[in-house]
């Protein structure tokens, strides 16, 4: 409550009044083992919230935005379990597992949709309310996001304003602008997907670990001891580098997670000495 987090919000669009619930899944929490936040069981939490909505709100639809995900094994598929356990949900917009569902999953009167990952698709669907008050999915498609789509001018103006804010309030402290070119690249770096699926040496990880070493050895706090190993957690890598110009924005996108104790965006870089004794 101190951070303005609500159990649900009610949205009015035309003649339709919908309650939207958000939930964080079990596997998602396990992916952040050092997280100090504690969550209720997602199914029980959503069930309780839906009961509250039914009691206190007159809505036509209940939608759930979930970071639970879907798996091939239906018995382990968190959002499918959620659909079965909380049948009053009309629509689950699923995330976390990056699943690209070409067709919606249906359990009872609940539909589950997911459009993949990294903004590559836009999900579009239509639903029609039935006589019993529930909803039927009448159309659903994934629209690839490409340069063929003409930008909406009003939305683009908002994006440009936010980008200017990033330049002024963040990057200017380091003497950079987001479009500034840092390097020319002629290397075919590994894709982001390969970082998470290939358990082997990758050139994307190599350049990032080399950057860690460079940053430590050029820090004002460097004590002169050589750096033997640099560790790059693959889950924190959020972008790769394509051939051509590498800009400040490209580099930031590849390391865009986290925040330091000083409030500055980005995980802090730390150095440590590992001691061992000979057998």
Predicted segments with their positions:
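Solvent-exposed loop/linker segments at secondary-structure transitions
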Residues: 54, 126-278
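Acidic, metal/ion-coordinating pockets
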Residues: 1-148
């Amino acid at each position: 409550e101190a951070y303005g987090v609500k159990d649900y919000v009610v949205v009015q669009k035309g003649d339709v009044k919908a309650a939207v619930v958000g939930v964080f899944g079990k596997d998602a929490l396990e992916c952040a083992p050092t997280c100090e936040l504690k969550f209720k069981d997602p199914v029980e939490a959503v069930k309780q919230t839906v009961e509250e909505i039914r009691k206190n709100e007159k809505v036509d639809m209940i939608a759930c935005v979930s970071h639970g995900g879907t798996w091939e094994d239906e018995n382990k598929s968190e959002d499918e379990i959620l659909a079965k356990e909380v049948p009053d949900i009309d629509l689950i917009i699923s995330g976390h597992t990056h699943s690209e569902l070409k067709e919606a999953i249906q359990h009872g009167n609940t539909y589950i949709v997911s459009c993949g990952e990294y903004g590559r698709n836009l999900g579009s669907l239509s639903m029609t309310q039935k006589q019993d008050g529930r909803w039927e999915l009448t159309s659903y498609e994934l629209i690839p996001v490409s340069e063929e789509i003409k930008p909406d001018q009003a939305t683009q103006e908002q994006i440009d304003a936010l980008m200017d804010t990033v330049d002024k309030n963040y990057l200017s402290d380091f003497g950079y602008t987001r479009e500034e070119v840092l390097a020319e690249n002629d290397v075919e770096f590994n894709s982001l997907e390969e970082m998470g699926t290939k358990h082997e040496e990758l050139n994307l990880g190599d350049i990032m670990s080399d950057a860690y070493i460079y940053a430590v050895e050029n820090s004002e706090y460097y004590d002169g001891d050589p750096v033997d190993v640099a560790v790059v957690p693959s889950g924190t890598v959020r972008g790769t580098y394509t051939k051509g110009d590498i800009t400040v924005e490209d580099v930031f996108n590849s390391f865009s997670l986290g925040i330091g104790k000083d409030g500055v965006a980005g995980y802090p870089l730390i150095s440590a000495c590992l001691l061992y004794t000979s057998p």
